[in-house]
Amino acid sequence: MASVSTHENQEKGPHLPPPSKQSLLFCPKSKLHIHRSEISKIIRECQEESFWKRALPFSLVSMLVTQGLVHHGYLAANPRFGSLPKVALAGILGFGLGKASYIGVCQSKFHSFEGQLRGAGFGPGHNRHCLLTCEECKTKHGLSQERSSQPSAS
């Protein structure tokens, strides 16, 4: 019997707090519309692109240059390990520099995405007021907006 009542609650939609617990700034549509999939997609793209376009090339080039410098005698090889420590360090530094050099591109992707979603969970306007026009928001905030838009008689 308890499973029937929980099943009925699931059909109504996502769980919303009771009206007594909701703040005056609550808007059910804006709370339900969070773009997590798009954000995770941008993060994944940034990770893949930064690896293939910057980190891997920087790492390989720095390793090849370091090996060339060791081979031509500009850098001394370690007597026990040879050129391996210097080449490995160059690869790690090149990888880190490549990842760091791609930060600006990822930031621009997030800024362009933020511009598309202005007010829907991003930016300085987030959670200040209901930016979507929903029926509950119209009824709750309609009276207060009408009062504030009328000029005072004094």
UniProtKB/Swiss-Prot annotation:
Subcellular compartments: Endosome; Mitochondrion; Mitochondrion inner membrane
Entry keyword annotation includes Mitochondrion: yes
List of residues that carry N6-acetyllysine: K41
Keyword match Membrane: yes
Keywords, comma-separated and alphabetical: Acetylation, Endosome, Membrane, Mitochondrion, Mitochondrion inner membrane
Pfam families associated with the record: OCIA
Main location: other
Gene Ontology cellular component annotations, sorted alphabetically: endosome
GO biological process: response to bacterium
Matches recorded under InterPro entries: OCAD1/2, OCIA_dom
Organism superkingdom: Eukaryota
Domain OCIA stretches: 1-120
Annotated region described as Disordered, given as residue ranges: 1-23
Purpose: Has an essential role in the assembly of mitochondrial respiratory chain complex III. Is also required for STAT3 activation and plays a role in cell migration.
Assembly: Interacts (via OCIA domain) with OCIAD1/ASRIJ and STAT3.
Annotated protein name in UniProt: OCIA domain-containing protein 2
Species name: Bos taurus (Bovine)
